[in-house]
Curated annotation (Swiss-Prot):
This is DNA repair protein RecO. Belongs to the RecO family. Keywords: DNA damage, DNA recombination, DNA repair. It comes from Serratia proteamaculans (strain 568). Signal peptide: none annotated.
Length: 243
């Protein structure tokens, strides 16, 4: 690749004695795997910038699944995530590493990701709000298009006071059954608008995104969720829910 491209490090691990294997999310090529040769050596000027949550400009080259990082520059300082916000960011990074195909264009999702990180860093909204909004954006970009505002059975607009049961690949159908797969019309409107004004709608959003993302994760648990739980256990006033 000849030009520079905006990117973030999703995950990095040591490779050989002095190199790094990087999973990166780029604006134009989606998720790419890059080998940063010599990045761990004492003389490398890449050490400080190849960190999660640092906006980068990168260039790479080569063939095959793993490309070679040619250059990388930090556009600005890393976004200041700490505490719950840091673990929320790690969750988002792991989610992208797990569900995105390599070298597929997710240019709009890149901006959703940036917006999520900026919201977490600024603490403009609760981490739960930011995560649910991003998960719904991610599902939309993965082609998981659902109509939250109409009953899949009748085609009628959802009623705030009625209950609808989620059926995979079909949508939401009016039902008298109230269980894990059931949502009120009010909760469905919140999902459609990606705005969650209270604990009830936030929990409903979490329930739905967990169900919808499960097939993409292949039954393998996310490590970041366990790290978050360990962090929460140490807090004097733990939050209502985990990531």
């Amino acid at each position: 690749m000849d030009g520079w491209e905006r990117a973030f490090v999703l995950h990095g691990r040591p490779y050989s004695e002095t190199s790094l294997m990087l999973d990166m999310f780029t604006e134009g090529h989606g998720r790419v795997r890059l080998l940063a040769k010599g990045a761990r050596s004492r003389r490398s000027n890449l050490k400080g910038c190849l960190q999660p949550f640092t906006p980068l400009l990168v260039r790479w080259g080569g063939r095959g699944e793993v490309k070679t990082l040619r250059s990388a520059e930090a556009v600005s300082l890393g976004l200041p995530l700490s505490g719950m916000m840091l673990y929320s960011g790690l969750y988002v990074n792991e989610l992208l590493s797990r569900v995105l195909e390599q070298e597929a264009n997710y240019s709009v999702l890149f901006f959703d990701y940036l917006q999520c990180l900026q919201a977490l860093a600024a603490e403009d909204v609760s981490p739960e709000q930011a995560l649910r909004q991003f998960e719904l954006a991610l599902l939309n970009h993965l082609g998981y298009g659902l109509d939250f505002l109409h009953c899949a059975g009748s085609g009628l607009p959802v009623d705030d006071g009625m209950t609808y049961r989620y059926r995979e690949e079909k949508g939401f159908i009016a039902s008298l059954v109230v269980d894990h797969y059931s949502f009120t019309g009010r909760e469905l409107r919140a999902l459609a608008e990606r705005q969650f004004p209270d604990v009830q709608t936030l929990r409903a959003a979490k329930r739905f995104t967990r169900m919808a993302l499960k097939p993409y994760l292949g039954g393998k648990p996310l490590k970041s969720r366990e790290l978050f739980r360990q962090f929460v256990r140490k807090q004097p006033d733990p939050p209502v829910d985990d990531a």
